[in-house]
Amino acid sequence: LDKIVIEGGHRLEGKVRINGAKNAALPIMAACLLLHGPSRIKGIPNIVDIQTQIKILKNLGGDIRHIEDGSLGIIFRDGEHKEKITAPYDLVRKMRASVCVLGPLLSKRGNAKVSYPGGCVIGQRPIDLHLKGLKALGARIETDEGYVIASAGTLKGTRISLKGQYGTTVLGTCNVMTAAVLAEGTTIIEDAACEPEVQDLAYFLNKAGAKISGIGGSILTIEGVKELHGVDYEIIPDRIEAGTFMIAGAITKGEITLENVRNDHLVATIEKLREIGVEVTANGNTAVVKSNNTYRPANITTMPYPCLPTDMQAQFMALLCTISGKSVIAEKIFPDRFIHSAELRRMGADIRVDVPYATINGSPFLSGTHVMVSDLRAGAGLVLAGLVAKGTTHIHRIYHLDRGYEQIEKRLSKLGAHITRVSE
């Protein structure tokens, strides 16, 4: 196992190119199950979650190749591998998004056997809304020894609400959308997730011949079609990776230019950084983050898009820990998502958690120590804290980080961080 070692206190400067969005790439790769003919998908990051998804799709009969320009060629040959319908536990347990093969398998092969998903341990994330939506389209669903077993004759369009206890469901919307594109008749999804990654899947499917309207809103209308064809498509840039690098610039009082960003997907993050006192200049597909001033504490509430994403909460917590004064974070998506606060406290942060709130009494003095990563974004928060902590920070269990960030230590090092990856 590897760990990351950071010597804090170095200002970051320079340019960084943002990769394609992991959370758009995973459902789009799964949706290739629906297509007749080859697809070429550009901008897919080289991270562990993508490697896991490639294994799952190969298991289902996919022919997947890395193309020289960094894109991925994916083809499922019609008529072959109809019997391959299983996404096994040993792969699915590694990441939650692997459940998004359920809709395409059911739609294209009439059967699916998918293990209950894994991923990061951040509280209740059930898939009941996925199953409710698929049942409404006519699927028969049972569970057996940790597997969802789904079967269907012809799926039929209907009206479905995906509203749940915790609001909308991103992967549930993806699963129902991919199941509905080849269904008979029209499907209306109410309370659909509006996240850019859901929009990206819809645009991808439309390019392949689907008829989806209302993209970006909470009501999606899907007219079923007979067939979808292969396409060339470029994934949107990763708004969470972009936000993470923005905070890296802010927390070290540096100046970073981000290239390949969609600033329209980053409005809430940019607005909050400006409120804190960070200078952010968003222009076309670049953004420049710099700071000369004193920062102000802030209150943050995580909510579904277009509000501040829960996946940026740990990174903002790290920043707020370094700003004198009282800040409050309200975590409205995953109320238990504060595991990283205990590790930040080890570094000297003053954080009190009273779910779903965390109250931070910030001060500019964090100290390096040994900390452990509990989940992907918590890992990013600890790296950011390590960049400014006095002394040396050792970050253990970084396999969580590798699930979502490609070579984060090399990219931060290029910006001037004193950061290395070493074997434990």
Residue ranges of model-derived segments:
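Short, structured segments at the rim of ligand-binding sites
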Residues: 1-424
